[in-house]
């Protein structure tokens, strides 16, 4: 069986116009996959050079396959049908290591055609590293490497205004474009680079903040033999991902034309502010996960897919989204509903086995950031507590007993909550405190909730009633009236 390379698998090759920091699965099944579609269907005509930003030889370089690899996109499509689509990606030309090919790295700045910089250097990547110097070959941090590359371009083209770049980070931090820009400016000032360069950074370059959304499951280790048999070739860089994807870019409207998004419809939005889209994702996608986990797990289920195929649990989650979360969010209702419908489809994806216990990690913080804002907004606007979000809080407190049907399970959270719950549930079992007192102690933790939740009218009583129902009847019976 042949391994992928451009000699045995000839096809389109595009001029290099995109630099990408990061060789990982996510960018390859997200950005490079989208670039490949745009190259095929429009005149974008842009090849990618991947820069490996860290010093490691594992996995090996994409250049061993001449930049070629296969994505397998699978999940439920818009009609709810299970689909699996293999695509040979030709958008990546080569990969270089900034550590062993530093001169080659700087040379990227000399190419007049270079226009875009994408990156995913993990959440920790957009950060300041105190020891980084201009002459380091290379500097440690990604922002310092980028500053050096931008200065190389500025110098090579004598500060030409039309040679700036559009910089689009995909790291999962809030306003990632702003954060990256601030660090680049910080290094430029620290390294005493000329004022003209700092002006050029501001005037000729765009730093765009983004929201990225796609579950990328990466190299399908358990299915490789079967998949390669179907494909007819060996591919050491196979990359699997879900069907859904969303790319929200806060940037100039002209970006849509530059990326040829006006010529081929991708799920990419160019917006003035990513904040409402971030809130939508946190409230609907992450919020639904957080509401679902303690309810479904204590109802005897183990994965998100099982939960969504369970008529009662699925109804509980969908009603929580449509009746309690969406009404308090600040975006057009039709946009929110179409996003919600995509979310429930993603939860049903038969190709992804998402363990409820792995999502349960740090559940107390997740509840505070993902569900509490909607619970409080609902109470404020209607004068009544949203029944399902309140029940989810009771289910969460019950979850920290760490016991299901007489068997224990691991609970992962910070030490404070693990100790607190161990103490509270032990006191409850020994009848030292009642359910209402237990709930009041949890809700009074100002340091965690950033307010005293016992002051929210009716919340302690409602959560205590729900918790008693869970303890007395079991989760299935307790949740049924809300399904």
UniProtKB/Swiss-Prot annotation:
Kindly state one GO CC term assigned in the UniProt record. Answer: cytosol
The UniProt GO MF terms for this protein read: mannitol-1-phosphate 5-dehydrogenase activity; tagaturonate reductase activity
EC number(s) on file = 1.1.1.58
Concerning Pfam families, the annotation shows: Mannitol_dh (PF01232), Mannitol_dh_C (PF08125)
Q: What class of enzyme is it?
A: oxidoreductase
Positions of NAD(+) binding: 18-29
Q: Which UniProt keywords apply?
A: NAD, Oxidoreductase
Which reaction(s) does the protein catalyse, per the Swiss-Prot or TrEMBL entry?
Answer: D-altronate + NAD(+) = keto-D-tagaturonate + NADH + H(+)
InterPro entries with a match to the protein in the record: 6-PGluconate_DH-like_C_sf, 6PGD_dom2, Altronate_OxRdtase, Mannitol_DH_C, Mannitol_DH_N, NAD(P)-bd_dom_sf
Q: Which GO terms describe its biological process?
A: D-galacturonate catabolic process; mannitol catabolic process
SUPFAM superfamilies (UniProt xref): 6-phosphogluconate dehydrogenase C-terminal domain-like, NAD(P)-binding Rossmann-fold domains
Pathway per the UniProt entry: Carbohydrate metabolism; pentose and glucuronate interconversion
Write out the similarity annotation: Belongs to the mannitol dehydrogenase family. UxaB subfamily.
Q: What is this protein called?
A: Altronate oxidoreductase
